[in-house]
Amino acid sequence: MSTVVVVGTQWGDEGKGKITDYLAESAEVVARYQGGNNAGHTIIFDGNKYKLHLIPSGIFYSDKTCVIGNGMVIDPKALVKELEYIHSFGFSTSNLKISDRAHVILPYHIKLDGVEEDSRGANKIGTTRKGIGPAYMDKAARIGIRIADLLDRDEFARKLERNLAEKNMLLEKLYNTTGFELKEILDEYLALAEIIRPYVTDTSVVLNDSIDSGNRVLFEGAQGVLLDIDQGTYPYVTSSNPIAGGVTIGSGVGPTKIHQVIGVAKAYTTRVGDGPFLTELNDATGDHIREVGFEYGTTTGRPRRVGWFDSVVVRHARRVSGITGLAITKLDTLSGIETLRICTAYKYNGEIIESFPANLNLLAKCEPVYEELPGWTEDITGIRNLNDLPENARHYIERITQLTGIPMSIFSVGPDREQTVVVRGIYG
């Protein structure tokens, strides 16, 4: 029995899709447990690049069961579009299972997400405007509509009518914009429900039965620890729990069944959206890393903010997610930079801070404490063994493991599968 969770240790976009896709080859089940179509993951499969937002990375393996767990919020239109996208390349999706307890994103969630963000003015939180936050708000307020409701025509109609009365009032009276017609949404989403219906089941049964049978199960997190609603840079966060603990809530699998947590980190740091970012590079080096690493959002296309590796951030991720192994991606992007920096701590009013502050005003006043390391000029994209790395590259990632306190499990020197190097066994 072996279960592995893959989490991002930074602000998302760490390369989790690549690592998950690699590890999925040895798993029988791949599951997502939180988020929605607000985060994308890019997968290279058989030399081709695919971009997914909702469906787990393992979908391209016909012999793997792929699960969309109860902790996710699902936009049925986006889901059907993604199914059609996968089918267009000749892949089957018969191996997909969708939780009947997952919540549904509806048109009013998406519209409210946009108008609420616009109303914040200079205090925008950087939402992707996909309706994620409003859907999770309804879930917490106990007025959400779940997949099980969507498949029950009468129940869906009843709950939709109730919710539209409130949502239309908000849109029309508070935000001075138009609301929605009940019949229009009802007809469209009942049709979508019939497309989704064959995939829907109690996924907690699927997952627990698989684990109890001794199968390898891989849980795929979206976003990253610093975007976690509890442990991240609140309020500049997502509306769910990407940390490893989110697996138990978002999949219906108990904590005693989680065995390994792999934390994925870029060899530097990136962030999309607003909020403090102490190691950010607003200079030629930052521009160079952005272009070489092609640091643009999968979902939004927005240029990502780029900075040096921050060990304070990753130590925080290790602590709150119980990370047992580190996967460092995009090491090759740093080739050719003469001097590299790693943030080892923060300084506030002359005091050294080694843990990540919750107070963002305090965080914004901190200064990063850097350690400089020599870079390397060699092309490392063909490296397939840790000991074959240039001395400076090897020393760089060894220093990262020392500062974060996480043993190295994987490093990556390019986008392709064969450019993923396993240093330490994952599944045991």
Swiss-Prot record:
The keyword Nucleotide-binding applies. GO terms for cellular component: cytoplasm. The keyword Magnesium applies. Its cofactor is Mg(2+). IMP binds at residues 13-16, 38-41, 128, 142, 223, 238, 302. Its EC number is 6.3.4.4. SMART domains: Adenylsucc_synt. Pfam families: Adenylsucc_synt. GTP binds at residues 12-18, 40-42, 304, 330-332, 412-414. The active site is at residues 13, 41. Pathway: Purine metabolism; AMP biosynthesis via de novo pathway; AMP from IMP: step 1/2. It catalyses: IMP + L-aspartate + GTP = N(6)-(1,2-dicarboxyethyl)-AMP + GDP + phosphate + 2 H(+). This is Adenylosuccinate synthetase. The gene is purA.
